[in-house]
Amino acid sequence: DAQTAPDVLGRLPIIDKRLIKDRFNDFVSAAFRRAALVEGHTNGSTGAPFAFYMNRRRRDRVRAETLFFGRWTGYRIGEPHVFLRLLFWHPKPVIARLLENQVILEPRGLGSVEIDRLLHRIGRSKAVTLIGYPSVLALLARRRLEAGGSASFPMRSAISIGEILLPGARETIERGFGCPVFERYRATEVGYIAHDCQDHRLHLNVGSLWIELLPPESGTTAAETA
């Protein structure tokens, strides 16, 4: 509970995905039948892809978080949106993308030809929200600014994922696509960790997670938790 969780977190060792993968069965709760759980997969962006399980209540909660935080950006369920991401492993099924009105585009190469092709497909999608790595979004935005932003983009918001959103990149993306930019910190296996609001302040997802702040590469638990 809220009184004891900080003390409990402080006693837990720091682990990584490789350790979980190597000793997977030790981490599976005996309170749930494996057959009744939903299997998920990380995309391998940290170099250690692995499968994990959640119960249906947890899966539905993550979906609810997507809708809740999406409203902060102006997105409404069912509206067309483009997701710029690398497809490391287990891409979302086609039927799921169709139901969500989602277009997934893979940003590879990113020479002038590839950038123009991506911009063309984004414009053709009529998406109201654009999701992607800030470095890629900024690259596309600069290309649009160089071209005078002639193509019509009915963009309502852009969402930065997977990397730190630097102030210069935020400004470039906002100018290039003519919409506000929001930061999203999310992990496939735990859901939403933090999300930007319209005042550009990050809010921790304390409704679903206990979040411990650790010194980088310290190997020890932090003195403070959030």
Regions inferred by a protein language model and the residue ranges of each:
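Nucleotide 5′-phosphate-binding alpha/beta core
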Residues: 1-41, 47-79, 87, 124-131, ...
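A broad, structure-centric signal for solvent-exposed, well-ordered loop/edge residues
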Residues: 16-22, 27, 91, 112, ...
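Conserved AMP-binding loop of ANL adenylate-forming enzymes
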Residues: 67-109, 162
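Active-site glycine/GP-rich loop and adjacent strand/helix microenvironment
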Residues: 99-226
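Short, charge-rich amphipathic segments
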Residues: 46-58, 98-111
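Intrinsically disordered, low-complexity boundary segments flanking structured domains
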Residues: 7-13, 68-71, 89-95, 181, ...
